[in-house]
Amino acid sequence: MTKQDYMDEAEQVLFHVYNRFPVVFDHGEGVYLYDTDGKDYLDFASGIGVMAFGYGNRDYNDALTKQIGKILHTSNLYYHPPLVEAGKKLTRVSQMDKAFFTNSGAEAIEGAIKVAKKYAYLRDGHAGHEVIAMEHSFHGRTVGALSVTGTDHYREPFYPLMDGVKFATFNDLDSVKQQVTTATCAILLEPLQGEGGIYPATKEFLEGLRQLCDEKDILLIFDEIQCGMGRTGAMYTWQHYGVKPDIMTTAKALGGGVPVGAFLVTNRVAEASLVPGDHGTTYGGNPFVCAAVSKSIDLMEELQLPEHVQQVTPYFEEALAQLTKEYEFILGTAAWASCKDF
């Protein structure tokens, strides 16, 4: 089949919800993708932040092949070694206490919201609690995740969304405080806004949120789906600030290309929120994806990817600054690890 044949047949059988580029990729190796004609492309997108250690890594491929030969899937009603190993490694590098594996970042957000609502339900003895999210944020495309996404053009066609959501101005503590009521159960934000324009939270803002949440018994949720897994020079962005959340979500590079996400909580939250029957998943945390998570974390550490980000940041800052001088339409630049408020 020719490239055009693939594209034509795709339009016949696939729901047209992506404006795809006219290229058909066949395989990848290192930082390059190769199309069906053999042409190579330097992959600056990394599969939208997923392929942190590139394509065709032999250790990663061997680990997944080995797991396929053992067992791909079993119910979450049973234990299996890859689940335990992945959980141990993820809680260690995230500095959180308990993990729940999901199939995507959006599912992780949904789970985080449920944890916060159940925590408040047990605390107050009734439902009807609210979440404060940030303007210009992005948390996913499921109805719940979209409800806490502060970008109107994503939300508007799907009203009414989940109620009990208020929006505050990012990096404006007073704006958040104005939205807090006795019904507030959580404050949700990205420590480094991605879709909103690569905007880092200030240290003062995160410290103020932490203090506010502690005073009001509100749970602080950090969405690290896009900015986590080494992209800012630490495994998770909040670790730069030293402001620990009560709940954290992660995905993207977590599985090295395999669909997986997770939400993590502190022991305090785990002991006062979800119980058996409150939440679950068929595929989340199965042996195959957990083998991928475990090997991805291993490679992150073996290849010292967070440290590498720190090393190459000055080069990118200089190169990006030069582009602003050469092209008038570039108003400014931002890099994941060049945020000076840490």
Located regions from the model:
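Conserved N-terminal phosphate-binding loop of PLP-dependent enzymes in the Aspartate aminotransferase
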Residues: M1-F342
